[in-house]
């Protein structure tokens, strides 16, 4: 457990998204169009929450009126938000509305029906197959969310992904005008380290393997446990696995993970749950390696946090992970536990190699911090403002009810095609019933005794 210091304060400052004091653009006059944001939930300490607040700081510094409208918010952030229904009162065809898309929220549906020029920001939706047999409701919500995304294809003046990977999904979904609004995370929440935490008890000379993220199926925590088991039994018995992140809502998956630990009889696996920012910083400080086996990420901020805290990263090369790491750290392409354990041993037993990895991560982090988030955002806002005034889409009172019925029909088509093949092709249900009644009568006539027919 070698304690590491984070990057210099000056570097950290340049990486804060939406730095206050961004230059105000000239030549717009006293009245500037409002640029509001709408999303389902503003969470405390999560990547989307940081991005939303950063966007607001940039917009306000540039002279725009900018509010955050939500359905729900963490109690610690409620004072920074307004109820999504208030958006109706401030809506205008000349305004820009930045819509952070999420699955099936009422806030999203209100935003859809307003005349504001919409800029959709897509943070990705996990493919539903990851949650089969673990969270049936989430399977349905993710399936519907990915389908609902298509309803906004012609509603937006721009559709932005917060990574190149997410933008590629927008292009594949048929959005005609797309771009990348890069995530430039703030690391200010890691500036202070708690004293007297459980993390300090792990700073004892053992090798600490760390993962930070929710305990959910697409993060493949089960693969992390299998890899750690191979490393501990074959390479280093004085090692422990620290799993930091909430498992709320995924009790069944969490129980499966605990059962896996018991089945493998692997000791020193610690499920640490959700922790404070100060405790999180302490866990990064005692970590010797950040290990990631996730198979679906839209960006993955904890990878950048590990870079910032100078913890060498070994991650599975899937979805947005390679582009997020941008040449820093080490990627692996096979999930063989013995293979990954050997790579872990090669890294941790070679101090010079660790320094080379940390240098590659520092360079990647510098490239990330050098991205002009403020300028990129304001250019996209100007592009949206230059679009013709918005027109409220013609939405019937039962539009979303009909959309949900179509979703259900599409789900049947994909997963129970035989049910659709059983429906009449050219006739209505009434015609089909009439035809069936006639056929029944004919069969009865043919099957009756000769005397009755005569």
Roles of regions detected by a PLM:
Residues 71-74, 238-255:
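Glycosyltransferase donor-sugar binding loop
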Residues 153-196:
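Donor nucleotide-sugar binding/catalytic pocket of nucleotide-sugar-dependent glycosyltransferases
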Residues 160, 199-219, 224-228, 242:
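Conserved donor-binding/catalytic core segment of Leloir-type glycosyltransferases
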Residues 254-278:
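Nucleotide-activated donor-binding/catalytic signature segment of Leloir-type glycosyltransferases, i.e.
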Residues 295:
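Aromatic "clamp/platform" in nucleotide-sugar-dependent glycosyltransferases that forms part
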């Amino acid at each position: 457990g070698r304690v590491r210091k984070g990057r210099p304060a000056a570097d950290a400052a340049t990486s804060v998204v939406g730095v206050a004091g961004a230059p105000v653009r000239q030549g717009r006059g006293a009245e500037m169009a409002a640029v509001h944001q709408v999303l389902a939930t503003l969470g405390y300490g999560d990547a989307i929450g940081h991005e939303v607040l950063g966007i607001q700081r940039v917009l306000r510094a540039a002279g725009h009126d900018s509010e955050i409208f939500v359905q729900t918010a963490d109690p610690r952030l409620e004072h920074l938000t307004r109820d999504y229904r208030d958006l109706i009162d401030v809506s205008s065809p000349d305004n820009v509305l930045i819509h952070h898309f999420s699955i099936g929220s009422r806030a999203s549906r209100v935003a859809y029906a307003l005349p504001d020029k919409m800029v959709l920001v897509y943070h990705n939706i996990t493919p539903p197959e990851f949650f089969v047999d673990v969270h049936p409701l989430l399977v349905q919500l993710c399936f519907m969310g990915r389908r609902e995304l298509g309803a906004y294809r012609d509603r937006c003046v721009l559709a932005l992904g917060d990574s190149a990977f997410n933008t590629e999904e927008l292009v594949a979904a048929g959005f005609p005008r797309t771009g990348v609004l890069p995530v430039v995370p703030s690391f200010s929440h890691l500036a202070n380290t708690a004293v007297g935490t459980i993390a300090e008890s792990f700073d004892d000379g053992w090798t600490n393997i760390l993962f930070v993220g929710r305990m959910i199926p697409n993060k493949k925590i089960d693969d992390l446990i299998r890899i750690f088991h191979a490393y501990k039994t074959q390479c280093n018995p004085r090692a422990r696995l620290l799993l930091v992140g909430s498992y709320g809502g995924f009790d069944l998956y969490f129980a499966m993970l605990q059962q896996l630990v018991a089945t493998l009889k692997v000791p020193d696996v610690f499920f640490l749950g959700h922790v404070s920012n100060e405790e999180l910083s302490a866990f990064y400080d005692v970590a010797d390696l950040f290990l990631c086996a996730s198979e679906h990420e839209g960006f993955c901020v904890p990878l950048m946090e590990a870079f910032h805290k100078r913890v060498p990263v070994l991650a599975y090369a899937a979805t947005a992970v390679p582009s997020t790491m941008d040449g820093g750290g080490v990627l692996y392409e096979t999930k063989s536990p013995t293979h990954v354990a050997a790579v872990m041993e090669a890294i941790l037993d070679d101090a010079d190699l660790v320094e080379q990895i940390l240098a590659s991560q520092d360079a990647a982090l510098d490239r990330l911090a050098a991205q002009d988030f403020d300028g990129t955002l304001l250019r996209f806002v100007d592009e949206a403002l230059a679009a013709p005034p918005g027109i409220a889409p013609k939405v019937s009172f039962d539009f979303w009810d009909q959309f949900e019925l179509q979703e259900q029909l599409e789900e049947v088509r994909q997963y129970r095609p035989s049910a659709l093949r059983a429906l009449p092709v050219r006739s209505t249900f009434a015609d089909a019933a009439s035809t069936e009644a006639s056929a029944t009568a004919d069969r009865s006539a043919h099957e009756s005794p000769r005397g009755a027919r005569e």
